[in-house]
Amino acid sequence: MKKAKAIFSLVVALMVLAIFCFAQNTGSTATTAAAAVDSNNDDWLHCKGNKIYDMYGNEVWLTGANWFGFNCSENCFHGAWYDVKTILTSIADRGINLLRIPISTELLYSWMIGKPNPVSSVTASNNPPYHVVNPDFYDPETDDVKNSMEIFDIIMGYCKELGIKVMIDIHSPDANNSGHNYELWYGKETSTCGVVTTKMWIDTLVWLADKYKNDDTIIAFDLKNEPHGKRGYTAEVPKLLAKWDNSTDENNWKYAAETCAKAILEVNPKVLIVIEGVEQYPKTEKGYTYDTPDIWGATGDASPWYSAWWGGNLRGVKDYPIDLGPLNSQIVYSPHDYGPSVYAQPWFEKDFTMQTLLDDYWYDTWAYIHDQGIAPILIGEWGGHMDGGKNQKWMTLLRDYIVQNRIHHTFWCINPNSGDTGGLLGNDWSTWDEAKYALLKPALWQTKDGKFIGLDHKIPLGSKGISLGEYYGTPQASDPPATPTATPTKPAASSTPSFIYGDINSDGNVNSTDLGILKRIIVKNPPASANMDAADVNADGKVNSTDYTVLKRYLLRSIDKLPHTT
C-alpha cells in the first residue's frame, strides 16, 4: 500500500505542476486549470504500415483542419480580432482533433534568438465588464498585446485544455501572406532575418521541437508546405525547382527532408514527421531524370513529366523512399489535393468519378503509398467552394475516399478569408458554413452515436467529444511502440497486490475514464488489462452496478474516500 500511496503522491505532484504551467494569468478558474491536467508525454504517436497508433498500440485517426495566420505578416492567427479561445472551443466542439498551424521560418527564427516579432491585427483587452477579448493576450505592464511567441504558447495551452492536438506546418520561409507561392524552403529574403538558409530552416524546427519535447500538444511537424517548381525547357536545371531524387543537391527535397527529420528526431524521437511531395516527377521508367528538359507542347505520354498539385506529387517514394533508419516509424507522407475551382486540371475534364480520379491521378501520385501499406497518408490540405457543381462533386468524392480508407487529413480551412476555397467559418468568425461542415463531418473521427474522438488519452475533445482513453477504455499493449521511447512505468507485480481503489486502468488517477471502464466490466466487455481489484470499490468481493454507483458518487464528491463499505 505504501507503493500505491507513493504513486498517488507522484500523480498529485504532476497534477499540481500541470495546473501551474497551464493556468492563465487572467480569466482562469480552478475548473479550467483542472481540465488542462495532462501527463504531457502519453499521447505521442507512431506508424506501422499505413496506420498510426498511440503508444499503447491503439489505432488513431487524425481528422482536422487548418487555421492560418502565423505564416503571414500578422504573425498570429487571422481572426484574432475576435476571441481566439472562443473560436478554438467551437473547433473542438465540432470534432476537429488536429489543428494544422501554418507558420514561417522567419517568425520561428525571431523566437529562437529571443526577439519575438510583434503581432498585428490582434485585439487584446481585459477590462471587465466593459470589454474582454483575448484577455490572456493582454500585457498589463505594457498596456498592449503580448508578443507572438507568448501568444503562441498561450494558444498551445488552450489546445491542450480543449483536447486539440497540433501539427506545425512550415508554410513559407518569410512571413508573407502569399509566401506559399515561393518554391523552396531556403533562399528567400525576409524583412527581419536576412535570407533564410537551409540551416536556418532546420535549426528553427529543431529549436521548436526541443521547446515542446515534453508537451505532447504538438504531435507532428509538416516540414515544408508545397515544395514545387517546374523543370522548364532550358538545358540548365532551374534553381527554383524542388526535386525528388537520390542526390545531395540543396534543392533535392527528399534529401533535405531526411536531413531535417533526423535533426528533429534527435531531440524528440516521438513526434511524427510529415513530408509532402513536389510538383513534377520525371518518367523514370522511360529513363528521364531532372536533367531532362520539358518538351514544348508535349502532353500525356509524350511528356517526360508527371505533374501534380504543388507538394502533391509523391511518385518519387516508390523509387527513393524517405529513410530515417530506426525511426522510419515516424514517417507520414502528405499530399495536397484540390478541385477544379482552384485549377482546371486535366483529370477534371471528363465526367469524373472516384475511380477515374484514382486511375488518372490519385493512385499513382499518392494513394499507392496507403494502398500498398508503405506508410500512412495525411492529406494536409483539401477543401473548396460549395459550388453545387464539379468542385463540390470532387470534394464529396475525396471525402468518401478518405472515409472508406480512413485517410488522415486536415481540411483547408477554418479561415473564411482563403480566396481559393473559402472556409468553414463565416466572416464573423463564429457562424459556421453548415453545408460545408456537413460535407466534412462524416470524415471526422467519431463513435457510432456521434461522439467525436480526440487524440488525448485523458482530456475529451471539447464539450461534445470523448478522450482516447474513454474510447478505448484503457491502454492496450497489443502493438508496442516502434520508436525508442520509454514504456509507461506501472506498479511491479508482488505477492501483496498494490493498487488504488477506483484506479481501474492503473494510471495513478481515479477519474471518469475509470468509470467508463467499470461500465464496460459490468456489461461483460472488460478491457483485458482492467484491474478488477481496483474496480471493487465497495470491497465486497464482487464487481457490479453497486460499484458503479459508488465510484460515480466518489467522482461527484458525495463520498470522500474509497473503498466505501457502508
UniProtKB/Swiss-Prot annotation:
Reactions it catalyzes = Endohydrolysis of (1->4)-beta-D-glucosidic linkages in cellulose, lichenin and cereal beta-D-glucans
Task: Report biased composition (Low complexity) as residue ranges.
Answer: 474-494
Looking up SUPFAM superfamilies in the UniProt record yields:
(Trans)glycosidases (SSF51445), Type I dockerin domain (SSF63446)
Which keywords does this Swiss-Prot/TrEMBL entry list? Carbohydrate metabolism, Cellulose degradation, Glycosidase, Hydrolase, Polysaccharide degradation, Signal
The GO cellular component terms are: cellulosome
Please give one Gene Ontology molecular function term for this protein. Answer: cellulase activity
Q: What is its EC number?
A: 3.2.1.4
Which InterPro entries did the record assign?
Answer: Dockerin_1_rpt (IPR002105), Dockerin_dom (IPR016134), Dockerin_dom_sf (IPR036439), EF_Hand_1_Ca_BS (IPR018247), Glyco_hydro_5 (IPR001547), Glyco_hydro_5_CS (IPR018087), Glycoside_hydrolase_SF (IPR017853)
Query: What does this protein's UniProt record list under function?
Result: This enzyme catalyzes the endohydrolysis of 1,4-beta-glucosidic linkages in cellulose, lichenin and cereal beta-D-glucans.
Q: What is this protein called?
A: Endoglucanase G
